[in-house]
Swiss-Prot record:
Family designation: Belongs to the GADD45 family.
Gene from which the chain derives: GADD45B
PANTHER family linked: GROWTH ARREST AND DNA DAMAGE-INDUCIBLE PROTEIN GADD45, GROWTH ARREST AND DNA DAMAGE-INDUCIBLE PROTEIN GADD45 BETA
Keyword field contains Chloroplast: no
SUPFAM superfamilies referenced in this protein's UniProt entry, alphabetically: L30e-like
Keywords assigned: Apoptosis, Developmental protein, Differentiation
GO CC terms: cytoplasm; nucleus
Subunit comment: Interacts with GADD45GIP1.
Function: Involved in the regulation of growth and apoptosis. Mediates activation of stress-responsive MTK1/MEKK4 MAPKKK.
Domain of life: Eukaryota
Protein's name in the database: Growth arrest and DNA damage-inducible protein GADD45 beta
Leader sequence segment: none
Amino acid sequence: MTLEELVACDNAAQKMQTVSAAVEELLVAAQLQDRLTVGVYESAKLMNVDPDSVVLCLLAIDEEEEDDIALQIHFTLIQSFCCENDIDIVRVSGMQRLAQLLGEPAETQGTTEARDLHCLLVTNPHTDTWKSHGLVEVASYCEESRGNNQWVPYISLQER
């Protein structure tokens, strides 16, 4: 490896950590301000009714779920809709960290069903101009990725 390649790899890893932290910050803020829609079906309903209010779509999946054909079909349809409506999309791994961020119980004791965290939408109503540092950082990362022909960028949320 050349020095330039080593620096590029180091910069990419640094950027990934920065964007990952921005996504975490954004999700917590969006949930606190009731700007987060959770679940594949709930997200599809919202995008059908008011796609202009959606500013970011997170598609979350871990490696062991990659073979779930139904989920992949849902993701393909959601990605298509997001591209058509100029909604930023990010693929995310680290479902356990995602659940932790959103305050999901560690174990469901059979009393409550865990929420579907595979699709998350961050909304920004037309009457409000909410700008969070996390949203700006993630939007910038998405734009930069599209410039590199990576239409659906990927980040990994790290366990803590």
